[in-house]
Amino acid sequence: MLGVRRALLLPPLQLALLVAAGTGARVSAPRSLAWGPGLHADAVLPVRYFFLQSVDSDGRNFTSSPPGQTQFKVVVKSLSPKELVRIYVPKPLDRNDGTFLVRYRMHETVHEGLKIEILYGGEHVAQSPYILKGPVYHEYCDCPEDDPQAWQKTLSCPANEPQIEQDFISFPSINLQQMLKEVPKRFGDERGAIVHYTILNNHIYRRSLGKYTDFKMFSDEILLSLARKVTLPDLEFYINLGDWPLEHRKVNDTPGPIPIISWCGSLDSRDIILPTYDVTHSTLEAMRGVTNDLLSVQGNTGPSWINKTEKAFFRGRDSREERLQLVLLSKENPQLLDAGITGYFFFQEKEKELGKAKLMGFFDFFKYKYQVNVDGTVAAYRYPYLMLGDSLVLKQESPYYEHFYVELRPWKHYVPIKRNLSDLLEKVKWAKENDEEAKRIAKEGQLTARDLLQPPRLYCYYYRVLQKYAERQVSKPMIRDGMERVPQPDDSTSVRQCHRKRPEREEL
């Protein structure tokens, strides 16, 4: 049964009607529901999306895929026949719980607006057709909203993020001059992976500190994407592109900690955490450069629970010794665990003993009922995607965390396993013997992950971190020597079609 507290996932008027439709029921197009950011012109995202809830003629929600061959059909087109635009609309993703996820990616801006038709068996669904009055901007249109509060309201940003509040407790004020002196000395050596950013007048500037800064392409792309959507505060900060969090000083130390921004946190560090480059890149490149993203995984969760293989499953690199232990456990207990290493780098001498497993498509992981999540060098960045599936996640206890872990609870959203994996087999046996409880935890984890990992929420999180940081600066951010401007991708239509900008006049 779907939870009733997730307003972004279920339309409010339907919250009282969560009664499963009968097995012989048919979908009623008029009574079915459509909602989500993709039905609103102002909610600019790389991939726009919305949800469908299949409902029968008695007003009861389907809680599994509707029977029969009829499918939802969605057409997204320009309101004006004079505007010829490319819009990619794949077929709706069946989330196997009676809901569907509809995605579309715009490749040009539409000035007049969009018309979205949602059909089932030739009938319009809910309030279809939906009219999105123009302009409707595509991802690369540089047209930021000047009112951050209005932008946050459009995306339904949460009032607060617990991890952000926790991270900034250590930094009631931020001394840029102190950081300018300390960061290059402490973290900017030959092995460093630090990028120094300044955002000024919504333009982004940076300089690299250290040798290993190629991953700045990932921090660049999400900052540029954010700046195209909303006017950012002026600020100056350092992003750590490496795996491990850097600042280990305690609040009471002298000198105290400095606010380094990282993608992964740990219990013994003070870094400020942002969503990982993996989830932001997959969000930016969804339906274009990547196939596994926070949306696509929701429609590729494998067989239904009852038809999944009753084993725990793992595939991955050898980036932590416990992963090798998984393979040994698997060899000794093949009836409970299927684990394999797909690539050796850290423990190459073990390949002959443990063998090398063939690569598998990520979506095939969900053929198995239980997923083992073990750290890599730090937190395993597959974890968000595993949580969005409908398998039960067995998560290794870890000092490392991503931005959303603070919202998850053991035995409610996942089953914990000890750091040394000594209780893994015991937990697999428990899950097999308590199938309904295991299924309930898996479902609760999936629904919570759907809420926490929506693409708009990532943008909200990024903006809130930058905003909190900017509020605490005690001196004015500046463009420093050696910084270069990071240009927006070229889009000749941006200025012409952005209603918030006037074309720049050419100098005579």
From Swiss-Prot:
Family matches, as SMART domains: CAP10 (SM00672), IG_FLMN (SM00557)
Segments of this protein annotated with the region Disordered: 480-508
Signal peptide: 1-24
Record flagged with keyword Ribonucleoprotein: no
Residue positions with a glycan: N307
SUPFAM superfamilies, A to Z: E set domains
Filamin repeats (start-end): 25-134
Keyword RNA-binding: no
EC number: 2.4.1.-, 2.4.2.-
Pathway this chain belongs to: Protein modification; protein glycosylation
Predominant location: endoplasmic reticulum
Biological process (GO), any one: protein O-linked glycosylation via serine
Transmembrane intervals: none
MF terms (GO), sorted A to Z: EGF-domain serine glucosyltransferase activity; EGF-domain serine xylosyltransferase activity; glucosyltransferase activity; UDP-glucosyltransferase activity; UDP-xylosyltransferase activity
Function: Protein glucosyltransferase that catalyzes the transfer of glucose from UDP-glucose to a serine residue within the consensus sequence peptide C-X-N-T-X-G-S-F-X-C. Can also catalyze the transfer of xylose from UDP-xylose but less efficiently. Specifically targets extracellular EGF repeats of proteins such as NOTCH1, NOTCH3, FBN1, FBN2 and LTBP1. May regulate the transport of NOTCH1 and NOTCH3 to the plasma membrane and thereby the Notch signaling pathway.
Protein name in the entry: Protein O-glucosyltransferase 3
Native organism: Rattus norvegicus (Rat)
Gene: Poglut3
